[in-house]
């Protein structure tokens, strides 16, 4: 290989530490949680376009798959799901650069002189197709890729290779990529750092047999991260192979538009002993017993994520001594009970949809039991949720006793509706359950009466979707006058309600601070922002909620 390499193929997320070599030291593992999230309002906009459970689970043959309305519905759902998935471990979009220096012995193959461990490290940072091509460089390189830890993505094996998970792949392209995956799994000895299989249908009989072979290969060859995303036509009535539970090296697992393996009858040893992150995106399960089984058999699980509709809606019981973050985004669940999760600091429930026509009416019940480490909770919405703390149902006018308080929570996000009288009455009772809150995020609200966390602890208030209505201004006025510790007030304007942020800022300042001395909470800094809309509004990603290097994942909207 002529020349001296001074650049390398870059990726959005290096796989260096995820593909260890035998002797060479690996650089510190970069956090896999690197993508920005969106405000809850923009997340709701994206989520509202997600297809309904009926349209997704409807058996779709070749004729129905051509239905333009069904295709559009599934495409929107896939687009929403894909935004929740982790970034690729390696990239086909990186650049490879080199320079030739005659003074430094140009033309001499210096890379081939490196130890095998370092060469395997080089190959492991390449997409599978490029990694295989290194065998053609010289005799020295031929055996390297066969023993290098690989990142295998079928999207990289498409004729038009891409990092993105495509919402539509032609049958010919999907078959070609699947054939390439089969060849790689047959000849490569492993290990596989990551396998992302997302470009083909997994429901047809031939595809199911092929998937079973793939999973067997990956289990034997120690895959560490696995993403399985089904493509239309979707049926969801056939279970994934139970081979999934033989992948004992798995640390991260994401499934989308698939039916979870039946857990009844699995051998006693079936488990995910190293699994740290599990994401279920529009997945069908036999019932809450399957989820209970997964939690019980995943002793290292730290992050649990739900995106899109679960079939059927789950009764989620959180019993885990390892869980640190649970996120539920636009997913219908009947209830979320934190039964025993002593190490859980984050519970994020966003945009859970209301019951649709023909469904049993009622809210998703959120019960907080043994969660002494819980520090962040939101977005709670009384139109969608009912709250229970211990054995106490929290309703408007509830006299909150010590047993109904969660003093560990420091960051709280709420969604209250000014024009709904019951919401306005509910807010004071709800806030009294969280007496130590320091950072409060509100999507429309109303209140009254003395509240400990408001008076003594809240330092930051972020108010989303401000429209300038009298009820909104009255709430902000109450809050500013009551909150003795308030340091920053951030008002995020709803799109199209003001000609400029200056107009909105003037209206807020006039209502809150006009004629008042700069004393007490009047010293709080006011920041008025314009809400991002449309394509400029980033989508909520689980990577942000699970990134513990960020003290407050909701704070992305607040400039620091």
Predicted regions located by residue number:
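Conserved hydrophobic position(s) of the canonical leucine-rich repeat
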Residues: 192, 223, 250, 275-278, ...
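A structural signal for leucine-rich repeat
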Residues: 242-247, 266-274, 291-299, 315-323, ...
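C-terminal closing repeat unit and adjoining cap/tail of repeat-based domains
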Residues: 67-77, 444-560
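Solvent-exposed loop/turn tips at the surfaces of repeat/solenoid architectures
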Residues: 200, 231, 253-258, 278-283, ...
């Amino acid at each position: 290989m002529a020349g001296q390499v001074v650049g390398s193929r870059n990726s959005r997320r290096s796989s260096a530490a995820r593909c260890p070599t035998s002797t060479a030291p690996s650089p510190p593992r970069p956090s896999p949680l690197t993508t920005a999230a969106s405000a809850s309002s923009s997340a709701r906009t994206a989520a509202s376009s997600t297809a309904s459970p009926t349209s997704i689970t409807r058996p779709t043959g070749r004729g129905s798959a051509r239905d333009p309305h069904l295709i559009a519905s599934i495409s929107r759902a896939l687009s929403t799901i894909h935004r929740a998935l982790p970034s690729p471990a390696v990239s086909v979009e990186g650049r490879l650069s080199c320079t030739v220096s005659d003074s430094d012995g140009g033309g001499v193959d210096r890379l081939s002189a490196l130890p095998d461990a370092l060469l395997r490290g080089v190959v492991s940072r390449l997409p599978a197709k490029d990694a295989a091509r290194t065998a053609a460089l010289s005799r020295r390189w031929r055996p390297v890729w066969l023993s290098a830890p690989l990142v295998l993505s079928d999207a990289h094996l498409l004729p038009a290779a891409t990092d993105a998970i495509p919402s539509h792949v032609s049958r010919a392209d999907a078959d070609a990529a699947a054939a390439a995956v089969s060849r790689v799994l047959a000849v490569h000895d492993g290990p596989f750092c990551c396998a992302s299989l997302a470009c083909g249908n997994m429901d047809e009989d031939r595809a199911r047999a092929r998937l079973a072979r793939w999973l067997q290969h990956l289990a034997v060859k120690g895959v560490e991260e696995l993403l399985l995303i089904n493509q239309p036509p979707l049926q969801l009535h056939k279970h994934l192979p139970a081979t999934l539970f033989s992948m004992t090296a798995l640390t991260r697992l994401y499934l989308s538009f698939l039916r979870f393996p039946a857990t009844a009858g699995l051998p006693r040893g079936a488990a995910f002993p190293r699994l740290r992150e599990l994401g279920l995106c529009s997945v069908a399960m036999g019932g809450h017993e399957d989820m209970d089984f997964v939690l019980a058999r995943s002793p290292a699980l730290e992050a649990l994520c739900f995106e899109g509709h679960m079939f059927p809606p789950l009764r989620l019981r959180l019993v885990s001594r390892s869980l640190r973050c649970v996120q539920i985004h636009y997913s219908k669940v009947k209830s979320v009970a934190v039964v025993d999760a002593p190490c859980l600091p984050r519970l994020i429930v966003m945009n859970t949809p209301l019951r649709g026509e023909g469904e049993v009416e009622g809210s998703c019940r959120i019960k907080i039991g043994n969660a002494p480490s819980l520090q962040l909770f939101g977005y709670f919405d009384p139109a969608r949720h009912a709250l229970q703390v211990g054995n106490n149902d929290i309703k408007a006018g509830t006299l909150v006793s010590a047993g109904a308080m969660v003093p560990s929570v420091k960051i709280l996000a709420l969604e209250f509706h000014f024009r709904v009288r019951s919401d306005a009455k509910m807010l004071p009772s709800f806030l009294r359950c969280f007496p130590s809150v320091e950072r409060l995020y509100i999507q429309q609200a109303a209140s009254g009466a003395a509240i400990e966390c408001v008076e003594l602890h809240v330092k930051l208030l972020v108010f989303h979707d401000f429209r300038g209505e009298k009820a909104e201004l009255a709430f902000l006025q109450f809050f500013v006058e009551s909150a003795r510790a308030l340091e920053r007030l951030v008002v995020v304007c709803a799109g199209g309600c003001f000609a400029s942020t200056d107009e909105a800022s003037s209206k807020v300042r006039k209502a809150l601070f006009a004629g008042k001395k700069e004393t007490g909470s009047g010293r709080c800094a006011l920041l008025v922002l314009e809400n991002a809309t449309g394509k400029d509004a980033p989508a909520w990603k689980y990577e942000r909620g699970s990134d513990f290097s960020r003290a407050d994942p909701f704070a992305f909207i607040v400039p620091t």
